[in-house]
Swiss-Prot record:
Biological processes, Gene Ontology terms: protein quality control for misfolded or incompletely synthesized proteins
UniProt EC number: 3.4.21.92
Protein name: ATP-dependent Clp protease proteolytic subunit
HAMAP family xref list: ClpP
Reactions accelerated catalytically: Hydrolysis of proteins to small peptides in the presence of ATP and magnesium. alpha-casein is the usual test substrate. In the absence of ATP, only oligopeptides shorter than five residues are hydrolyzed (such as succinyl-Leu-Tyr-|-NHMec, and Leu-Tyr-Leu-|-Tyr-Trp, in which cleavage of the -Tyr-|-Leu- and -Tyr-|-Trp bonds also occurs)
Keywords for this protein: Cytoplasm, Hydrolase, Protease, Serine protease
Superkingdom of the organism of origin: Bacteria
Record function comment: Cleaves peptides in various proteins in a process that requires ATP hydrolysis. Has a chymotrypsin-like activity. Plays a major role in the degradation of misfolded proteins.
Source species: Francisella philomiragia subsp. philomiragia (strain ATCC 25017 / CCUG 19701 / FSC 153 / O#319-036)
Amino acid sequence: MITNNLVPTVIEKTAGGERAFDIYSRLLKERIVFLNGEVNDHSANLVIAQLLFLESEDPDKDIYFYINSPGGMVTAGMGVYDTMQFIKPDVNTICIGLAASMGSLLLAGGAKGKRYSLPSSQIMIHQPLGGFRGQASDIEIHAKNILRIKDRLNKVLAHHTGQDLETIVRDTDRDNFMMADEAKEYGLIDHVIESREAIIK
């Protein structure tokens, strides 16, 4: 199987001549961080590093975090979430396409009043998935841990949406897909936008 992981290059003209950037580095200059695809240790570490770098560059200037993700590893995603809460700059979150599972939690975890979605995007919340094989005692340990993780994720969603915990527990019991306007009504985002100008500066 052949995979194409080509990253586009942007040529920028400066006083000193031309300089080539990969597209993500060029976006980073505009304080834009992009999560595209699964949340895993690698993608999470890249996002965390970019967030910390942008804070060090200017702790008072907003960061724009674009999300198009089906979700992924809870531990990796919570590392990104905790970093978003830890750093000083407001992190604007913008859903383009899909923010599912851990992707939806990262979307909801943006700065209050600065969480956005494009109109055709979908947002999906659900409980964490788990599977483990081994001795019965080990399975029991992992089952207890996943219940603790589920409780933590539900509390985070309740905090950011304004929904009570009982509602979150019920609504995350199965895959729960929402269109952008429904996600706004639920409290996962603050604005449905159709143009860049609609993002609050």
